[in-house]
């Protein structure tokens, strides 16, 4: 087999030139296709509205600010149509005749000729004896924007605009120069190329002195100037025309008048198209804090400038734009009602929203420390779709939905230098990057790289939003989902390709009709891939040979002899669900069914989770209610027990207090006399020496009549029984001391007796009474 292939290649390449034959001239190879050309391969015929033209613009030295703004305005469909149709649309024949002179196609061999000339010059310099060899230059980076721009200038058609104001019936102005550019692009027969806006720049520098230098200019200032110039040129030209008669047109010319009006003919109503597209209305409300009078003033705007904050969004910046502002100190408000400067509150409200909203992010801020403008690299997120609300009561439309269609990006560290590029969303070719002469397709997510937080100096500077509807947004999202599914399918097909042939979904299934032929045996086997992991196979029981798996690597090798049909292994049964190959529409249908099934399962799972969560909350509430009832019952029982114990304590105290009240002072005297008589009896036992009579027993419960002598008689009796003490006078206070100590012992004994009868508090009261009597 190898010899067969070698002989085939040898025979195929054996056409050697004959001796003396003239070598053929090397044909120049065409330049490789750019990414934009690859994307435009499947486009149909050229459209008349110019929406399928993608032209770059040549940079004449720091004119990137002009190129980026002009690209954004061209791809605004209503603005482009209004410019082309005012005052009248130039016939396509006239445009083609003019473009035949202004459109220049470069020589496709210019690059090869330039390279050959450089090689000849290099060889000539090397042959000179006294010339030092040229240092080797580094090869150009073919992925750099500079190289791509140079190649675009060498390979793409160049479109030079000329002054055609006379054909419009107008004097040359900035508007007529803009119309020349738009009509040249629309009338060209090439979808790609490069415009040379030299005539437009000459008119701009002629009328405005600030743009005559080659210094870096501000793109937002140029946008504001261009829109105002267009308005001024259109209104000035309309004022020169005689007033239109009010008589009705003739029947035969009515259709032509309607057609001319619809295409933007020169009528008083058509001069307002710039205002209808870009003009909005703001209402400034100022309330004096002294007299509380509110004054209003309407202001028109063609673009809206908003202040920026770190880590914010366009929505928050617009909300801050409409926030209240305090006018005080040096910025007081002159109130006509008060007749002087007063403190006031000011607020800007949006009364009418434009169809095309040009949103200027104020990236350049003047700093007092540096005494100059400084660029703010704040992160400001801008959405693809923006909904704005009119904040006044008498607004015409309550809200409006916008979609982002263009972003002007400033690349640089400050306002005095840098570079501008434009990222624009086209009608049916997605997002494109316009960098002067270079035009390249980019992904939708590429727009998110210019919020201000990415590495580098590129930040979004001007955002262009155009009016849209909710239906259009939903349709666009559906189309994006379909494109992503197709891209995923293509990626899977690319991955499954083997040996240059697409892998079929049923490649692992071998039918009985697959009989190897002699031509199959002669096919080379050079790109066959061997598996690096063990192949998955099913388990076969009882060693059934008919159920053995058929491996993809099991077909006869080209180097092996041809085997008869009887030696081929049996084919396993094919499942019914894989008997047919699914076509792309069926794949899409299956994918839709699969997505619908997944969505249904997701919704069912979500309902189950909600049901379980509701049941869990219900059980938790029941437990909480049960705990609350139990706590209330325990608290109620504790209160009842507290009330019962309080009532018992009150009854016991009232019982004791009642007994004391019944006895009164006599009961206290009875207790005191009993204790005193008992104590005197003890003293008699200890101190009587001469008397042999036993002490008189005192009954434990004696009445007042049984107590006998009073306190004076008891003292006299004690003095008689006790021996006289000659060391101290009779009335000395020392006589009571031994009595008190002995009385303490007696009281200690009586306390035990009293505890058994009347409690511990009675013994304390007896001691107190005894001390009071003895003292």
UniProtKB/Swiss-Prot annotation:
GO MF term set: cysteine-type deubiquitinase activity
UniProt entry tagged with the keyword Nucleotide-binding: no
Stretches with biased composition (Basic and acidic residues): 36-45, 589-662, 739-757
UniProt-listed Gene3D superfamilies: Cysteine proteinases
Keywords on record: Coiled coil, Hydrolase, Protease, Thiol protease, Ubl conjugation pathway
One of the record's GO cellular component terms: cytosol
Listed Pfam families: UCH
Catalytic center residues: 64 (nucleophile), 419 (proton acceptor)
Function, as annotated: Ubiquitin thioesterase component of the regulatory network controlling carbon source utilization through ubiquitination and deubiquitination involving creA, creB, creC, creD and acrB. Deubiquitinates the creA catabolic repressor and the quinate permease qutD. Also plays a role in response to carbon starvation and the control of extracellular proteases activity.
Record family assignment: Belongs to the peptidase C19 family.
Assembly information from the UniProt record: Interacts with creA, creC and qutD.
Protein name: Probable ubiquitin carboxyl-terminal hydrolase creB
Organism from which the protein derives: Aspergillus fumigatus (strain ATCC MYA-4609 / CBS 101355 / FGSC A1100 / Af293) (Neosartorya fumigata)
Gene this protein is translated from: creB
